[in-house]
UniProtKB/Swiss-Prot annotation:
Co-factor(s): Cu cation; L-topaquinone
Enzyme Commission numbers on file: 1.4.3.21
Post-translational modification: Topaquinone (TPQ) is generated by copper-dependent autoxidation of a specific tyrosyl residue.
Alphabetized InterPro entries for the sequence: AGAO-like_N2, Cu_Am_Ox_Cu-bd, Cu_Am_ox_TPQ-bd, Cu_amine_oxidase, Cu_amine_oxidase_C, Cu_amine_oxidase_C_sf, Cu_amine_oxidase_N-reg
Protein name as annotated: Phenylethylamine oxidase
C-alpha cells in the first residue's frame, strides 16, 4: 500500500482541506454563510481552456441553500485572490432546486412521526410507529401546481423490527407522503388501501439465511514484490505503461479523469481532456399512484461523490493498492476527508496476444494487464462501483457495478406486469439504471470530429456472385442536430472520434472508436415527465461543441427541474462539430427486472463502454511488451 501526499503544483490537483477551509472563510467574510445557510455543492472549477499553471486562479463553485426559505445562491470563489467573484440568486421555480441535503432525510421522518394522517394510516395497518422508517426520496415534477417553487421530498415507509433488521424486506405499501422540507409541512398523505406487510426477513448475514458458510475457498494472494508499475506524483498524477493522467474527484460526479494521454515514442499524445460520469438516473416502471413518481437522479440530486465509501484492503480492493483520500465539504463548509475513497491498482488481465505459427515455428504469448481506478458509493438502497480501466493496447474502458438491495414493494395477489416477486408477498418494481458519460475529447488536440460506422451487407449479384461480401458505411456528423444518435446492434454501430488534421503513416486520420453495450435507452413514454427531465437517456449518443458552462447532461440544477435543461438546450444551438473542439456524451445503462436471486442482497451486475484505438497508432502498440517468466522458470513463448 503506497501513501499519497497531496501537493500544490498542478491546477488539476485534488482539493485540499486547507482550500475548503479558505472557501468557508471567504464566504463567511462576504456574509454568504451563516446559521441558516447550507452548502449543497462545493467543487473545484476546471482551469480555462489553454490556461497555464503559472497564471492559475484557483476557483471553487458553491451552491448555498437557505433553510429559512430565502433564495439559494450560486457562488464562485477565488481562493488565489481570497475573493467572491460572483454570487447569483436563483429562482428555483425556474432553475430547479439545489441537491438534496442529508439533514433533510431526518426532517421527513420527524415530521411524519407527528402527522395525524400518517399516524392514522399506520394505525390502520397495526404498525408500531417506533419501528417505521421512511425513505426520503427526490420528488420529480408532476401535476401538483402547489409544489412549484417549493422544496419537496416524498416518503415511503418500511418496517424495521430491530436495529440490525433490513427494513427493505418489510415495505408498507399503499402509502406515501409528500413533505415540504423548508416550511416543515406535510403537504399530502396518499393512502390507497392496506397491503399486508411482508413478514419474512431479508437479513443477509443471518445464519438462518446463509446456512453454514463455505469452507471450500482457498486463499488467493496477489503480490507485487517490487511494487506496482505505476507512479503517483503531485498527489494525483499517474504514469503507468505509457499512460499519463490526473485523477480528480468531484462531490457530484465522483472520480474525474483529466489529461488522459499515451506516450507514443517521444510524443505524449492527448486522447481525452476530461472524462466523467456526469449523470445517473434510476427511473422506475410501476404505474401505481404510490410509486409512479419514482425517478432518482443519483448524480444531480444526491451527489454520488458525497456518499463515496472508505475502501478496505482485501475487501473492496485486492492486491498492491494505492489509495487517494479526497476531501469534500460538509453542509457547513467544513472539510471532510473520505479516507481511501479512491482505489488504484494494476491487475493481470489474461492473454494480450498469442499465436503459434506453423510455418515459422514461432510460438508467441504475451500477458495483458490493466490499470484500475475506482470508487464505490452508496445511494440509499443501491451501491454502485465506478471503475475506469486503462489497457496496454491503448484501450480505455468504463464499467459500472450495481449491487446493494433492490427497492421493494408489496407483491399484489393477482400478480403484476410491472413488479417482480422476490419472496412471499414481497415485490420489486422494474426499473433502469441509466448513466451519461461526458467525454471531453482531445484526439491529438482539440480538432476532432465524429463518424458513425455501420456494417453493410452487400447484395448478391455482379461483383458479389457468391453473396459473401459485406462492407461498412461511415457518416460524418457535421452539426449538433445530426449528432443525436441511437445504437444499433443489428448493424454493429460504433462511433469514431478522429482528428482530421493528424494522420497515421497510412495517411488516415487518427482516432478512437466508441463501442456501446447496446442496452435499451429510457423506456418511459416520450410524453412522460421523466422523458423531459432525463432527455439524455432517450438517445445513446450526443455530440456538442465544447463550452465552459455545459457541464452536465441534465443541466446544473436537476432537483425538481421540469426539463429542457442540459443537452436539449445545448444542441438547440446547432453548432458545427466537424473538425471542432467537441464533447461526446454517451448514454448506457441496465434494464432491471429483479430476480429472486437478487434478494436479499444483489450480486453485482455490470454495464459500460469501451474506447479502442482506431488508426491512432501506426501499428500494434504492444510489440514492446516483454514475455512473462513461466512457472517453470523460463520465459513464455516469444
Amino acid at each position: 500500500m503506497t501513501p499519497s501526499t497531496i501537493q500544490t503544483a498542478s491546477p488539476f490537483r485534488l482539493a485540499s482541506a486547507g482550500e475548503i477551509s479558505e472557501v468557508q472563510g471567504i464566504l463567511r467574510t462576504a456574509g454568504l454563510l451563516g446559521p441558516e445557510k447550507r452548502i449543497a455543492y462545493l467543487g473545484v472549477l476546471d482551469p480555462a481552456r489553454g490556461a497555464g499553471s503559472e497564471a492559475e486562479d484557483r476557483r471553487f463553485r458553491v451552491f448555498i441553500h437557505d433553510v429559512s426559505g430565502a433564495r439559494p445562491q450560486e457562488v464562485t470563489v477565488s481562493v488565489t485572490n481570497g475573493t467572491v467573484i460572483s454570487a447569483v440568486e436563483l429562482d428555483t421555480a425556474a432553475t430547479g432546486e439545489l441537491p438534496v441535503l442529508e439533514e433533510e432525510f431526518e426532517v421527513v421522518e420527524q415530521l411524519l412521526a407527528t402527522d395525524e394522517r400518517w399516524l392514522k394510516a399506520l394505525a390502520a395497518r397495526n404498525l408500531d410507529v417506533s419501528k417505521v422508517r421512511v425513505a426520503p426520496l427526490s420528488a420529480g415534477v408532476f401535476e401538483y401546481a402547489e409544489e412549484r417553487g417549493r422544496r419537496i421530498l416524498r416518503g415511503l415507509a418500511f418496517v424495521q423490527d430491530f436495529p440490525e433488521d433490513s427494513a427493505w424486506a418489510h415495505p408498507v405499501d399503499g402509502l406515501v407522503a409528500y413533505v415540504d422540507v423548508v416550511s416543515k409541512e406535510v403537504t399530502r398523505v396518499i393512502d390507497t388501501g392496506v397491503f399486508p406487510v411482508p413478514a419474512e426477513h431479508g437479513n443477509y448475514t443471518d445464519p438462518e439465511l446463509t446456512g453454514p458458510l463455505r469452507t471450500t475457498q482457498k486463499p488467493i494472494s496477489i503480490t507485487q514484490p517490487e511494487g506496482p508499475s505505476f507512479t503517483v506524483t503531485g498527489g494525483n498524477h499517474i504514469e503507468w505503461e505509457k499512460w499519463s493522467l490526473d485523477v480528480g474527484f468531484d462531490v457530484r460526479e465522483g472520480v474525474v479523469l483529466h489529461n488522459i494521454a499515451f506516450r507514443d515514442g517521444d510524443r505524449l499524445r492527448p486522447i481525452i481532456n476530461r472524462a466523467s460520469i456526469a449523470e445517473m438516473v434510476v427511473p422506475y416502471g410501476d404505474p401505481s399512484p404510490i410509486r409512479s413518481w419514482q425517478n432518482y437522479f443519483d448524480t444531480g440530486e444526491y451527489l454520488v461523490g458525497q456518499y463515496a465509501n472508505s475502501l478496505e484492503l482485501g475487501c473492496d480492493c485486492l492486491g498492491d493498492i494505492t489509495y487517494l483520500s479526497p476531501v469534500i465539504s460538509d453542509a457547513f463548509g467544513n472539510p471532510r476527508e473520505i479516507r481511501n475513497g479512491i482505489c488504484m491498482h494494476e491487475e493481470d488481465w489474461g492473454i494480450l496476444a498469442k499465436h503459434s505459427d506453423l510455418w515459422s515455428g514461432i510460438n508467441y504469448t504475451r500477458r495483458n494487464r490493466r490499470m484500475v481506478i475506482s470508487f464505490f458509493t452508496t445511494i440509499g438502497n443501491y451501491d454502485y462501483g465506478f471503475y475506469w480501466y486503462l489497457y496496454l493496447d491503448g484501450t480505455i474502458e468504463f464499467e459500472a457495478k450495481a449491487t446493494g438491495v433492490v427497492f421493494t414493494s408489496a407483491f399484489p395477489e393477482g400478480g403484476s406486469d410491472n413488479i417482480s416477486q422476490l419472496a412471499p408477498g414481497l415485490g420489486a418494481p422494474f426499473h433502469q439504471h441509466i448513466f451519461s458519460a461526458r467525454l471531453d475529447m482531445a484526439i491529438d488536440g482539440f480538432t476532432n470530429r465524429v463518424e458513425e460506422e455501420d456494417v453493410v451487407r452487400q447484395t448478391m449479384g455482379p461483383g458479389n456472385e457468391r453473396g459473401n461480401a459485406f462492407s461498412r458505411k461511415r457518416t460524418v456528423l457535421t452539426r449538433e442536430s445530426e449528432a443525436v444518435r441511437e445504437a444499433d446492434a443489428r448493424t454493429g454501430r460504433t462511433w469514431i472520434i478522429s482528428n482530421p488534421e493528424s494522420k497515421n503513416r497510412l495517411n488516415e486520420p487518427v482516432g478512437y472508436k466508441l463501442h456501446a453495450h447496446n442496452q435499451p435507452t429510457l423506456l418511459a413514454d416520450p410524453g412522460s415527465s421523466i422523458a423531459r427531465r432525463a432527455a439524455f437517456a432517450t438517445k445513446d449518443l450526443w455530440v456538442t461543441r465544447y463550452a465552459d458552462d455545459e457541464r452536465y447532461p441534465t443541466g446544473d440544477f436537476v432537483n425538481q427541474h421540469s426539463g429542457g435543461a442540459g443537452l436539449p438546450s445545448y444542441i438547440a444551438q446547432d453548432r458545427d462539430i466537424d473538425g471542432q473542439d467537441i464533447v461526446v456524451w454517451h448514454t448506457f445503462g441496465l434494464t432491471h427486472f429483479p430476480r429472486v436471486e437478487d434478494w436479499p442482497i444483489m450480486p453485482v451486475d455490470t454495464v459500460g463502454f469501451k474506447l479502442r484505438p482506431e488508426g491512432f497508432f501506426d501499428r500494434s502498440p504492444v510489440l514492446d511488451v516483454p514475455a512473462n517468466p513461466s512457472q517453470s522458470g523460463s520465459h513464455c513463448h516469444g
